[in-house]
Every structure is written in structure tokens, then in C-alpha cells.
């Protein structure tokens, strides 16, 4: 034949995995990315719906109880790798939001998104943790998303949004006193004992785990 159909590419491992974690954001993502690209009037609403679905279902990435560091580190690394497709999906939508000058009308939705996922970094009473390593994978995910958020805003010269972020007071609905009911973007930067302890036991140590 004149034109030979190319062979199918390799299916990503995360799709074939039997126990893969899914956030159920596919439909909301496609709708949001389409509305943003087409300049639809309800594009901001579609973005808000996607961010809400994402933050609500991110809870599925929380790790189960574990009392052994090596086992916890293995689960930690697996969850980080499994999250990559969803991080990339989230980033792609954010890039399109910035390119289409929609960051101003979706800024509050993004702030509520970060408030929601920040709750997953808090210690759960019903879970037994490895010493000082509670919710480290969620802290890593949150920190990475915040860094990416700032980077994309800067790359697209959304300087007003960056300034607003740095001046925003986030609301902690679990706060008990006037001192912990609000917090700033600095709360999204975490020291991860999981990677620190693993680095201490490794033959080749990294100078900076956050760089």
C-alpha cells in the first residue's frame, strides 16, 4: 500500500496499572480546556468546576497508615509518580487560562483550590504515622503545584496575579484560634522528613532536597 498505517505507540504504565488512582477529572478537564480555548462566556465556571473536582478527589492520594520508613518511602515515591499525569493536566489548563487572559476571573477559584488541598497536609487522627513523616506526599504535591502556579504566572507576565497571591490570606476552616484561621502562601513550603531521612541513609547525598 502507498500509505502504511503507523504502529500504535506504547500505552503509558499508569493507564495499564490495575490499582491506579484516578481523580475523575477527565470530563471536567476537557470541558474547561475547550471553553477556555473557544472564549466561551462560562469558561471561568468550567475552570472552577474542574478545580473543585480535582481538589475533592485528590484525597485518594493520601497514603494509608504505615510504621516503617522504607515502606513509607516506597509508597511515597509511587504516589508522586502516579500523580504526574494529573499535575501535567492541571498545568496545561493553567497555561491556557493565562494565554487567554482569564487568570483574573479565575484567580479566586485557584485560591480556593489551594485552600482545599492544603487540608490534606494536616495530620489525620485515625492514621498511625512514621515519625515526623505524616502526609509528606501531600505536602510534596501541594508544594509542587504552588511552585508551578507561580512559575506559570511569571512566565505569562501575570504580575498582578503574583502580587495578589503574595498578599492573599488563605482561610483555614479547621483553625481553632485567631492565629491559625488564616495563613499566607509561605505555608505551602514544607520540610519533607521522608526525603530527608532517605537522603541521610543514601550513599550519595543531595546537598539540597528542595532545589
Spans of model-derived segments:
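Conserved beta-strand-loop-alpha-helix hinge of the TIR/SEFIR fold
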Residues: 1-2
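Acidic, PIN/NYN-like endoribonuclease modules and their adjacent C-terminal/linker elements
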Residues: 5
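Long, low-complexity, intrinsically disordered terminal regions
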Residues: 9-211
Amino acid at each position: 500500500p502507498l500509505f502504511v498505517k503507523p504502529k500504535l505507540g506504547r500505552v503509558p504504565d499508569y493507564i495499564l496499572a490495575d490499582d491506579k488512582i484516578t481523580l475523575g477529572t477527565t470530563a471536567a478537564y476537557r470541558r474547561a480546556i475547550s471553553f477556555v480555548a473557544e472564549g466561551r462566556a462560562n469558561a471561568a465556571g468550567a475552570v472552577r468546576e474542574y478545580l473543585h473536582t480535582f481538589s475533592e478527589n485528590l484525597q485518594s492520594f493520601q497514603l494509608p497508615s504505615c510504621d516503617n520508613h522504607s515502606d513509607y518511602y516506597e509508597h511515597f515515591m509511587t504516589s508522586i509518580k502516579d500523580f504526574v499525569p494529573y499535575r501535567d493536566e492541571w498545568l496545561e489548563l493553567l497555561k491556557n487560562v493565562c494565554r487567554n487572559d482569564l487568570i483574573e476571573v479565575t484567580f479566586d477559584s485557584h485560591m480556593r483550590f489551594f485552600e482545599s488541598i492544603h487540608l490534606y497536609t494536616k495530620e489525620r487522627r485515625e492514621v498511625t504515622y512514621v515519625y515526623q513523616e505524616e502526609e509528606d506526599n501531600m505536602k510534596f504535591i501541594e508544594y509542587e503545584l504552588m511552585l508551578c502556579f507561580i512559575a506559570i504566572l511569571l512566565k505569562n507576565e501575570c504580575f498582578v496575579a503574583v502580587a495578589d497571591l503574595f498578599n492573599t490570606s488563605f482561610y483555614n476552616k479547621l483553625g481553632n484560634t485567631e492565629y491559625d484561621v488564616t495563613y499566607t502562601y509561605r505555608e505551602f513550603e514544607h520540610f519533607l522528613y521522608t526525603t530527608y531521612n532517605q537522603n541521610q541513609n543514601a550513599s550519595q547525598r543531595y546537598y539540597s532536597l528542595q532545589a
